[in-house]
Amino acid sequence: GLDKTTERRDFNGDGDGRALVTVLEQAKKRGMRVGVVSTARVTHATPAATYAHVNERGLENDIAAQALPGDATFNKRLRGGLDLLMGGGRRYFCPSGMTDEEGESCSRTDGRDLRQEVQDAGYSYVYNRAEFNLLRKRDLPVLGLFDRSHMDYEYDRPYDLAGEPSISEMTSKAIDLLEGKRRDNKGYFLMVESGRIDHAHHASNADRAMVETEEFDKAIATALRKVDLRDPLIVVTADHSHVFTMAGYPLRPLHDLPYAPVSAPADYLDNTVDHSGILDVVYGISASSGEISAAGDKDSVPYTILGYWNGGNPYDTGAAGVYRDMALGRGDPRRD
């Protein structure tokens, strides 16, 4: 079983060395179409767990080769291969020493260009938003790789030069492509991951995490609109929780601090009531001036509305400046 003694090196198997059957392998065995969509690299942990078998999650070159038909390293339990694979991680599909479509370096060490191999096998390959928008049902199977590594945060996506689709757009397109002609379709299994919510939290960036979550909510709403719920099953879950906690008892909306009440309701002024200010930070807002005081409101009642932190100092001077500014939105106080 899985407990605190499980080590990172442990293999995803049944204990005697045999690889477990993945959910996409089961779907393929039933004759279903299968697809994977992620805003992270398509070779990252969550998407890879649906179709690949490796001893270590970091073996992303091997994971990429297992997803699509090419040579003996392909996961033959997937039969003809994934019908649809969209997300980031382009560098694991092209050989080192070569640059990709956006001039970024590739990472494969075996000299293989999986992008060309899958096109030779009948796949449609797209790498930007314009090509993505042109995809039609007849273009299945499809490989879409929209970034060298993880796709951009939703907040930053409009600034991508090549153009990237959003997770809600990829969800909509994937459903259209996988449904195909209903008369010859035995159904489909689609896994959609909003992988960058987690990344924003690890960077202690509450704002980008919230924007990612909002876009994921749009993706769920898109799926609910597009399918007939008398037949498909839509499951929304998470692989773990995170550090974003709404707490306290603010009467003001989160986005409109100047309009806070001067004091808390009377029942919260009773010393027998737990005030649950998660961060033990006391702020007061004057309804007349809108100014924030570190001393609290006139009754010294904490108005903590957000408990949030993950990891070390996000402004660590030892970190790469470009990454730090990208992740934390430094220079834009609304993003910190």
Annotate each PLM feature.
Residues 1-60, 73:
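Active-site nucleophile/metal-coordination loop of metallo-enzymes that catalyze phosphate/sulfate
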Residues 43-336:
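A post-motif C-terminal structural segment
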